[in-house]
């Protein structure tokens, strides 16, 4: 199972969980994080990621409890996207002012660009502090952006195997032509032959 599918499955298993007592912000997620009795939508997301084996030390070794901290981390680490994918961390800005008010996990993307997300600390009448884990349908106007906590490995092309270079074949040496050959006078070298020939022509040496 891929990391995105694993995160979605873990979040889905939490649907229906409610804080107790109501209105207290007291949850098992807050106890796990070490910060209970506080708004817990971001803590819920951190919990689901950690349970899937993804520990993002955004604010603490366990993740983040404050939505803007998550936004800054994803943006700084170039994992911030404008279009959703399943398993993304979705940040909402209800007023459209660029400030994250709430966070959840994308479960599915609809053809009309809306999403189904699983969110902690929400309710039908209170989007950001409702005290329950729920599935919510959200429209694009509410999206601030999407953090992608998964590093997708890109295939690296295998370099071609270098073939050993063949040494150039040596060309056989051509035998000198008759015109290139010098007359052989015994064991005389070429300069000696020329010298004797000149002397013979000048009458300084008898011809054998």
Language-model-detected regions and their locations in the chain:
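Aromatic- and glycine-rich peptidoglycan recognition patches
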Residues: 100-208
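Residue-level marker of positions within ordered structural domains that often coincide
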Residues: 16, 50, 95, 122, ...
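Residues in intrinsically disordered, low-complexity segments of regulatory proteins
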Residues: 31, 39, 72, 79, ...
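...with weaker cross-activation on analogous glycine-rich loops/strands in unrelated enzymes
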Residues: 8, 54-127
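Intrinsically disordered/low-complexity terminal segments and short unstructured peptides
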Residues: 1, 26, 59, 77, ...
